[in-house]
């Protein structure tokens, strides 16, 4: 699923974004943010973070630097615990 979402973002960046121009008020751009969020957090959480970011990108927003949050150590610990329980 991650691969499909990233491919769609790449298509948007190559085919659609040049026609719209550079309108994002944030760094990195919303499409780059979405790609990074999906790569770091997976398809579901990454899409959620990307949608939240796009909703914040509007003419009344000051914009600025808005980096993808690092993966939560609690989430990673839960994933490792699940992986260990499946090995038993």
UniProtKB/Swiss-Prot annotation:
CC per GO annotation: plasma membrane
InterPro entries, A to Z: Membr_insert_effic_factor_YidD
Keyword Methyltransferase in record: no
Domain of life: Bacteria
Membrane-protein topology: Peripheral membrane protein
Keywords: Cell inner membrane, Cell membrane, Membrane
Disulfide bonds: none
Pfam family, one: YidD
Family the UniProt entry places it in: Belongs to the UPF0161 family.
The protein's name: Putative membrane protein insertion efficiency factor
Originating species: Burkholderia cenocepacia (strain ATCC BAA-245 / DSM 16553 / LMG 16656 / NCTC 13227 / J2315 / CF5610)
């Amino acid at each position: 699923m991650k691969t499909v979402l990233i491919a769609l973002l790449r298509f948007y960046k190559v085919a659609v974004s040049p026609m719209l121009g550079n309108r994002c008020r944030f760094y990195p751009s919303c499409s780059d943010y979405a790609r990074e969020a999906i790569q770091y957090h997976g398809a579901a959480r990454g899409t959620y973070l990307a949608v939240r970011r796009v909703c914040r990108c509007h003419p009344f927003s000051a914009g600025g630097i808005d980096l993808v949050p690092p993966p939560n150590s609690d989430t990673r610990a839960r994933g490792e615990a699940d992986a260990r329980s499946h090995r038993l």
